[in-house]
């Protein structure tokens, strides 16, 4: 399975807004949700319970975002900034790392603090 950053974003923002554990999201196939939660757990962005059988994630429950997960969710909340990140980081090279994306988002946020407040959701 290939990592899909829109799916990652959707999971993080859903977990952040939820007051209860998440075991799936409408519009995301269960197998895709489970594997992306596993990636988020491995990256230290969520606290999750995973059921893994023969190296496949067969169930996942996300309890909460970690501190790092909260920070990343804050950075990707704005639809405008997220689209800009996709256009400038994710699409041009097709090859990137999570750390590159995080650093780009941090730079954009710090450079645009006065204007980002007006971007909305």
PLM-predicted stretches and their roles:
Residues 53-56:
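Short loop/turn motifs at secondary-structure junctions and domain boundaries
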Residues 78-121:
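Exposed, interaction-prone assembly regions rather than primary DNA-binding/catalytic cores
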Residues 48-51:
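Beta-hairpin "wing" of winged helix-turn-helix
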Residues 58-89:
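Short, amphipathic alpha-helical interaction segments positioned at domain boundaries
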